[in-house]
C-alpha cells in the first residue's frame, strides 16, 4: 500500500510539473504576441488553480473514505453547504463570465442610469424633436438586466469583472500569506531557542501595526497596482497564520512519531515536510478559508477610498461610483454591495463548516 501511494504521489508530481511547464510555455509565447491570451495576473490565477487541483482536489479523490467522512460532517451545516455552492458559482462566473458579458469599460451615455429589469426611474433626457430636456419614465431593458451606471456601463459586466478581481486578490494574497505564515510558524516551533524568539518577536512587531493603515501607507508610497496590492496584503497578513501554526507544531514536536523519525536519522527537512506540515494542514485550511473574506473586504475598501488599481473594475470601484448617485441610481451601489456581502458571508459559512468538520471535539 505504501509503495502504491508513493507511486501515485510521484505520478501526480510529474503531471503537476508538466502542467507548470505548459503554463510557462504559454506565458513565454504570450510575451511576443500582440493579442494577449491572459493578463499577467491571470497566470498566477491559473497557477493557483493547478495547485489546488493537484494538491487539494486530487487527494480528496484518491482518499474517498476520508473525503466522505469530512463531507458528511460538513454537510450537516446547511449554511456551509450554501457557502460552498455560492463560492463554486462565483468561481464559474469569474472564469467564463467575461466571455459572455459586455465590455465593463464600454461607455454609452445614451444608455446611462438604466434601472434593472422590472424597475423604472424618472430621468431627464434630451428630446430631439422638442429640442429640450424632458422628464420621462425610463424602464429597465434586457440588454442590461442589472442596469447601467452614470456612464452607461453595463452593471452585470462590471459585477462579473469585480468577481474575478476579488477572487484573484482573495486567493492569491491568501496563498502568499499562508505560505509565509506556515514557514515562519513551523520553523519557529521546530527550531526553538533563539530562532523561535527572533521569529516570534518579529511577528509580534508586525501585529502591532494596524493592518489596513499599513496597507494604505504601502500602496500610497508604491502605487495602486493590482499585483502590488495582492503582494502587499500577502506580505502583511501572515501573522495570524504564523502564531496558529506555531502553536500546533509545538504540540507535535515532542510526539512519539517525530522523536522516532529523528532517532532513525531523518533530516530536518523531511520531518518538517512529511510530518509537521501535513499534521497542521487542517488548521491551515481553516484559517485560509476564514482569511479570504477579510482580504476581499480589504481590497474593496482600498478601491472604495481611491487607492485601488484604476485600470480594473472591482466591486470597491463600483461602490465608490454608486455612492455619488444613490438618489438617482441606487442600484449602482446596492448591487455590488449585495454581491460583496454574500461573498464574504459564503466564505465565513464555509470556513465555519470546515473548522467543525476537522475538529473531532465538535458536537454535530
Question: What role is predicted for each listed range?
Answer:
Residues 1-178, 182, 322-346, 354-364:
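Gly/Trp-centered helix-boundary motif
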Amino acid at each position: 500500500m505504501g509503495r502504491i501511494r508513493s507511486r501515485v504521489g510521484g505520478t501526480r508530481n510529474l503531471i503537476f510539473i508538466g502542467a507548470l511547464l505548459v503554463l510557462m510555455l504559454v506565458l513565454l509565447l504570450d510575451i511576443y504576441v500582440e493579442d494577449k491570451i491572459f493578463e499577467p495576473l491571470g497566470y498566477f490565477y491559473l497557477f493557483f488553480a493547478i495547485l489546488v487541483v493537484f494538491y487539494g482536489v486530487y487527494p480528496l479523490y484518491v482518499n474517498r473514505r476520508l473525503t466522505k467522512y469530512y463531507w458528511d460532517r460538513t454537510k450537516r451545516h446547511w449554511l456551509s453547504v450554501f457557502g460552498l455552492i455560492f463560492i463554486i458559482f462565483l468561481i464559474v462566473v469569474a472564469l467564463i463570465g467575461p466571455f459572455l458579458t459586455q465590455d465593463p469599460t464600454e461607455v454609452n451615455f445614451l444608455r446611462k442610469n438604466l434601472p434593472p429589469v422590472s424597475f423604472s426611474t424618472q430621468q431627464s433626457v434630451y428630446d430631439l424633436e422638442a429640442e429640450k430636456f424632458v422628464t420621462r419614465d425610463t424602464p429597465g431593458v434586457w440588454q442590461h438586466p442589472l442596469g447601467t451606471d452614470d456612464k452607461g456601463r453595463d452593471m452585470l459586466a462590471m459585477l462579473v469583472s469585480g468577481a474575478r478581481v476579488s477572487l484573484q486578490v482573495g486567493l492569491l494574497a491568501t496563498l502568499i500569506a499562508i505560505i509565509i505564515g506556515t514557514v515562519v510558524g513551523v520553523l519557529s516551533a521546530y527550531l526553538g531557542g533563539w530562532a523561535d524568539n527572533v521569529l516570534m518577536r518579529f511577528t509580534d512587531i508586525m501585529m502591532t501595526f494596524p493592518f489596513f493603515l499599513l496597507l494604505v501607507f504601502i500602496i500610497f508610497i508604491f502605487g495602486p497596482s493590482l499585483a502590488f496590492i495582492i503582494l502587499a496584503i500577502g506580505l502583511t497578513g501572515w501573522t495570524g497564520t504564523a502564531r496558529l501554526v506555531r502553536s500546533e507544531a509545538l504540540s507535535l514536536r515532542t510526539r512519539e512519531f517525530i522523536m522516532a523519525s529523528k532517532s532513525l536519522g531523518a533530516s530536518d527537512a523531511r520531518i518538517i515536510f512529511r510530518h509537521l506540515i501535513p499534521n497542521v494542514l487542517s488548521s491551515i485550511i481553516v484559517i485560509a478559508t476564514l482569511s479570504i473574506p477579510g482580504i476581499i473586504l480589504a481590497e474593496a475598501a482600498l478601491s472604495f477610498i481611491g487607492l485601488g488599481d484604476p485600470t480594473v473594475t472591482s466591486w470597491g470601484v463600483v461602490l465608490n461610483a454608486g455612492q455619488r448617485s444613490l438618489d438617482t441610481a441606487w442600484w449602482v451601489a446596492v448591487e455590488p454591495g449585495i454581491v460583496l456581502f454574500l461573498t464574504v458571508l459564503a466564505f465565513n459559512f464555509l470556513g465555519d463548516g470546515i473548522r467543525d468538520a476537522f475538529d473531532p471535539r465538535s458536537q454535530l
